[in-house]
């Protein structure tokens, strides 16, 4: 990790730990609650920066990812949400690869997962958006929380763009 981070770990016992790694502030919350949507909402509520990146525990970020995200938001100042590429390791999981910058709309929003998504936190909070607690790993329905989140962003009128920048493997 080469940025400040909030890590939500779904395990017992409940614990909050904060530490520095290099010059970055890492906040680590362990809680027994289950559900990826709940974890993402918990992190979103505790975030202090305006630009936030959602992640999964199996990603390995490439050097300079923080600067790439900040630059992308500067390149798309009207964007509320940006979606990036994640490269599949050993082609075990095929992921849609963004080839050129484009606006995400109703006809193409369903192909992107939350782990490749960065947001302007103020836009999300102003529109009272959050991840569904019924969908996603650990919830009643085991997938779809990321698609519902992007759906809700579009419904709220947020501007979403896809950019051909790879952040992680």
Stretches with model-predicted labels:
Residues 1-30, 71:
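Acidic donor-binding segment of Leloir-type glycosyltransferases
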Residues 30-47:
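Glycine-rich, basic loop-to-helix element that forms the pyrophosphate-binding segment
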Residues 136-148:
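Acidic donor-binding loop at a coil-to-helix junction in glycosyltransferase catalytic cores
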Residues 64-97:
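Conserved donor NDP-sugar-binding/catalytic core segment of glycosyltransferases
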Residues 93-125:
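Short, flexible, basic/aromatic active-site loop/helix in glycosyltransferases
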Residues 52:
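Short aromatic/hydrophobic "clamp" motif used to bind/position activated sugar donors
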Residues 131-133, 157-168:
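Catalytic beta-strand/loop signature of glycosyltransferases that borders the donor
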Residues 56-60:
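The conserved acidic donor/metal-binding loop of glycosyltransferases
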